[in-house]
């Protein structure tokens, strides 16, 4: 009887340790880590911090499709901004829903996603682009933030993290962790 109890305690300990490892996998290594060496790459991001209820700073980033994306281009639309990483299993599992949201976006909202090459465990820009080409997401804009400044300005500490920006460009909320499609649509609908 004691062997069974010891075995269950041992199994529970292993399960707790494995759970902690899994949870920490989607956490960043350091909240303030920014790679200053990549600052010469294309992309302009304000160093100002985005604050809830205030107009967020504009940014200009290049997407994996080669297009230039500016937040200011979407004034008058609600913006769903998703920060994610290629190594984050939760992020990868939610990409099909995010792609569907991007396909369904109309005049009311836009979907943008952001990956930061060489930041917080993400692969290099070249490696990410090559990896991403193998995926089949046609409508999903993926913007590259090689300096990590956009991550810092939105206070991203874990992946995925979502930011909801209203039609006037104000940050309504940031939401770390998984959000399903229904919850995202409800959050967008609740905004002005």
Give the predicted meaning of each segment:
Residues 1-58, 192:
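N-terminal targeting signals for export/organelle localization
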Residues 128-165:
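Short, internal strand/loop/helix patches
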């Amino acid at each position: 009887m004691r062997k069974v109890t010891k075995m269950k305690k041992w199994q529970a300990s292993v399960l707790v340790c494995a759970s902690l490892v899994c949870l920490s996998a989607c956490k960043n290594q350091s909240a303030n880590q920014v790679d200053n060496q990549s600052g010469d790459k294309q992309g302009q991001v304000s160093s100002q911090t985005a604050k809830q209820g205030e107009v967020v700073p504009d940014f200009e980033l290049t997407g994996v499709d080669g297009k230039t994306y500016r937040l200011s281009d979407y004034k008058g639309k609600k913006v769903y901004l998703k920060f994610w990483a290629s190594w984050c299993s939760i992020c990868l599992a939610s990409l099909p829903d995010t792609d569907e949201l991007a396909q369904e976006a109309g005049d009311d909202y836009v979907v943008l996603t952001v990956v930061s090459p060489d930041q917080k465990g993400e692969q290099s820009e070249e490696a990410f682009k090559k990896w991403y080409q193998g995926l089949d997401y046609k409508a999903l804009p993926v913007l590259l933030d090689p300096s990590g400044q956009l991550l810092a300005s939105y206070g991203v500490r874990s992946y995925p993290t979502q930011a909801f920006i209203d039609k006037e460009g104000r940050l309504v909320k940031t939401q770390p962790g998984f959000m399903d499609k229904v919850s995202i649509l409800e959050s967008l609908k609740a905004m002005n």
